[in-house]
Amino acid sequence: MSMYDVLIIGAGPGGIFTAYELIERRPDLKIAIFEHGHELSRRKCPIDGEKIKSCIHCNCCSIMSGFGGAGAFSDGKYNITNDFGGTLYEYIGKKNAIELMEYVDKINLKFGGEGTKLYSTAGTKFKKTCMQHGLHLLD
């Protein structure tokens, strides 16, 4: 039987970053990550919009469970701001919250995000239309 120093339950962002931080600080640790969900290549949601139009409550949800959690199917955009999207700053202060967001962004870039095209709505008709309807967009 294999012995591990650390067992991490869940391979969502929290579990993945926990493993990363532990390895950075203690490369000697033997770490195992346990995940309920399917591997990425087997994560398929049965909702097709025709026969199945809404959630059928699968035993293991392929959207929420599996490596990367729900973020595995996102477009990968991060909002590096305290203006919306969460309230971490209420616990650690605005400056520290931004520093942590930038730290996470640097790690993501290190593992394949470098060359990602930046997207901005600044000065666009889309942004103007959104603002007219009370929607706030990050530039």
Report the location of each language-model feature.
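Beta1/beta-strand and adjacent pyrophosphate-binding region of the FAD-binding site
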Residues: 2-14, 32-34
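Nucleotide donor/acceptor-binding cores
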Residues: 4, 28-30, 138
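Generic N-terminal leader segments that precede the first folded domain
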Residues: 13-16, 39
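Aromatic pocket-lining residues of Rossmann-like dinucleotide-binding sites
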Residues: 18-22
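Short beta-strand "acidic-cap" motif of Rossmann-like dinucleotide-binding folds
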Residues: 28-35, 40
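Conserved N-terminal/central alpha/beta ligand/cofactor-binding core
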Residues: 39-43, 47-139
